[in-house]
From Swiss-Prot:
Substrates-to-products reaction catalysed: shikimate + NADP(+) = 3-dehydroshikimate + NADPH + H(+)
Assembly behavior: Homodimer.
GO molecular function, one term: NADP binding
Protein name: Shikimate dehydrogenase (NADP(+))
Length: 269
């Protein structure tokens, strides 16, 4: 039996085990998927240990994605992004990044074509970098903003994008076709709003990559009549891409989505 896992800190919230175990079962694979809490200083030990023990593959989540680049041999996408969320062991210890394609496919799933669209990307972490990289390839006109300007500037500089200070966020939202929250703001009760939701318009798309709950940002978007997209399908599509990397098989997307939505339904009862 092949063993797979997601590593992160915190990790208790992850729905990756539910999603991937459903996929393995649906495809008749002798495999199991687990979640392990790993801190950044032990990431190298964890990845090398997984390789030594014959793991089939790993996913990486907050805060490990950027640190992993120094441990793995990154593929072209992971190297360009500067972060890896997937590790394979078939041909050495390879790092991949499926977050960007996950976000791109999630937007397409809901009928959103970003080619030529003005996209405001809020955030500068590993997920934000992946989204910026992929949507730029998809033809979007991206402006990056972030509460910590140094990180936002670094992302924009690395990928050849425009950065604007977070203090301008209301004006940036007003002129954007698509607004993407790639931060953790909204994941917890009491989180402050990123901006005044009343400025949103019906013709806009609001994509919040948080999948564990309906955020205030998405509620504001729905009140405005805008298209509101949560992070569920990004989670599913990035997981599906990882599944294909590990197994070489067509991913059972419908099964993975159903498993995630069922788990979320239980969590939010």
């Amino acid at each position: 039996m092949k063993v797979y896992a997601v590593l992160g800190d915190p990790i208790e919230h992850s729905l990756s085990p539910v999603m991937h175990n459903a996929a393995f079962q649906a495809m008749g694979l002798q495999a199991s998927y687990h979640a392990f809490r790993v801190k950044i200083p032990r990431l190298r030990d964890a990845i090398l240990g997984a390789d030594a023990m014959g793991f089939g593959g790993l996913n990486l989540t907050i805060p490990l994605k950027e640190s992993a680049i120094s441990v793995v041999e990154p593929d072209e996408t992971a190297e360009a992004i500067g972060a890896a969320n997937t590790v394979s062991f078939q041909r050495g210890i390879r790092g991949h990044n499926t977050d960007g394609i996950g976000a791109s496919l999630a937007l397409r799933h809901y009928g959103v074509n970003v080619r030529g669209a003005d996209v405001l990307l809020i955030g500068a972490g590993g997920a934000a970098r992946a989204i910026a990289y992929q949507l730029s390839k998809d033809g979007a006109e991206i402006v990056v903003t972030n509460r910590t300007p140094e990180r936002g500037l670094a992302l924009a500089s690395d990928l050849g994008l425009e950065f604007r200070p977070f203090g301008e966020i209301d004006d940036l939202v007003r002129v954007s076709d698509v607004v993407i929250n790639a931060t953790s703001v909204g994941m917890r009760d009491g989180d402050p709003r990123l901006f005044d939701g009343s400025i949103l318009k019906a013709e806009q798309v609001v994509f919040d990559i948080i999948y564990s709950r309906e955020t205030e940002l998405l509620r504001d978007a729905r009140r405005a009549g805008a298209k509101a997209i949560d992070g569920v399908m990004m989670l599913v599509y990035q997981g599906a891409a990882a599944f294909r990397i590990w197994t070489g098989l067509d991913e059972p997307v419908d099964v993975m989505e159903a498993a995630v939505r069922a788990a979320l339904g239980r969590l939010n009862l």
